[in-house]
Amino acid sequence: MVDTKKQSFQNMLDYVHLYRLKNKLHRETADNDRKIRDNQKRVLLLDNLTQYITDAMSIEEIRAIIAHMRDDYENRVDDYMIRNAELSKQRREIRQKMAAHKQAPTVKTTD
């Protein structure tokens, strides 16, 4: 009986270890995916910039293009930050509803 409990406990510890390892690998994979995506975007940005810039352009014209692109990206960042705030608010509301469900007494029926 004692050996069975020890084995059961060990199995649970192994399961927790594997679950944490799986989550760690998932986070690392997601992080690598973000890095790949970011670098692909940088390559695309440089390609786009190369298309806009010609040999006949002055430095001022090139700076104007870069400034315009920067403004566009800053606006996108602001939009994403606003969207994240909205999503955080929704998540907070859902957590509160879930907590309320946990606090609600359960009604047991007898047959």
UniProtKB/Swiss-Prot annotation:
- Identify the NCBIfam families for this entry: PRK05423.1
Coiled-coil features, chain-numbered ranges = 70-104
Keywords from the UniProt entry: Coiled coil, Cytoplasm
Q: Which GO terms describe its cellular component?
A: cytosol
Write down what this protein is called.
Pole-localizer protein TmaR
Which function does this protein serve?
Pole-localizer protein involved in the regulation of several cellular processes.
The reply on keyword Coiled coil is yes
What family does the entry list?
Belongs to the pole-localizer TmaR family.
Q: Where in the cell is it found?
A: Cytoplasm
Q: Does the keyword Isomerase apply?
A: no
Source superkingdom: Bacteria
